[in-house]
Design a protein with these regions (language model features):
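Transmembrane-helix signature of polytopic, membrane-embedded enzymes
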Residues: 62-65, 83-102, 133
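TM-lumen/periplasm interface segments of multi-pass membrane proteins
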Residues: 1-87
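Perimembrane helix-loop-helix junctions
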Residues: 150-177
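Membrane-interface helix-boundary motifs at transmembrane edges
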Residues: 87-91, 128-129, 160-168
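Alpha-helical transmembrane segments of multipass membrane proteins
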Residues: 46, 174, 178-182, 186
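Membrane-interface alpha helices of multi-pass inner-membrane proteins
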Residues: 101-106, 122-123, 132-156, 178-181
Length: 187
């Protein structure tokens, strides 16, 4: 296996993607959350992405590598789309997201970009006062990674400062409902 030696750490090329493919039994046609002892520790939408890509790759000698490559392709596409969203939000800063060393270095470590893209869409729509779209996107983002839950605080403060209390309650309600929609069936 390409990631089975200590070299993955020495050469700074660790990735959860191939590691968890075998460790979480995705290579055995198992649903990400079916094991009571070895389930995926990621939130439900990330686990679904992991499971889906494990299903679409051809089985055979290079399964793990194929799994990694399919994920690489989609993560690269997400990275480019995130740069486009940043361009739509603030054109003068778009190049910064596209060449950010931390983003590039961590591009293929795990599936975080699936959460980042929905979080960026949430910011984009919030900025345009499309609160329903924004709340749906942040609910999806939280179902993909728990970090985006912290975006709710500044959103709540902005709506509170604008005295849009009903909109704040509606926003939080849509976010929670979206989160529950994806998570309750897996609980």
């Amino acid at each position: 296996s390409l990631w089975a030696t200590p070299d993955q750490y020495v050469h700074a090329c660790y990735s959860d993607i191939p590691s968890l493919y075998g460790e979480r039994e995705l290579d055995d046609d198992r649903w990400s959350y079916s094991s009571t002892t070895n389930a995926v520790e990621y939130p439900v939408l990330t686990g679904t992405v992991m499971w889906f890509f494990a299903r679409v790759i051809p089985s055979g000698e290079n399964e793990m590598l194929n799994y990694y490559r399919v994920n690489q392709i989609f993560l690269a596409g997400l990275f480019l789309f995130i740069a486009f969203i940043v361009y739509r939000i603030r054109p003068e800063f778009a190049y910064l997201s596209a060449i950010a060393p931390a983003a590039i270095a961590s591009l293929y470590i795990n599936w975080d970009l699936w959460a980042i893209i929905s979080m960026m869409l949430s910011i984009y729509w919030f900025d345009r006062k499309k609160y329903t779209h924004s709340a749906l996107a942040i609910g999806i983002s939280i179902s993909t990674k728990f970090l985006p839950i912290f975006l709710l605080l500044p959103i709540a403060l902005i709506l509170w400062r604008r005295n849009e209390i009903k909109e704040l309650a509606r926003y939080l309600g849509i976010t929670v409902a979206t989160f529950l929609l994806f998570n309750v069936p897996v609980m």
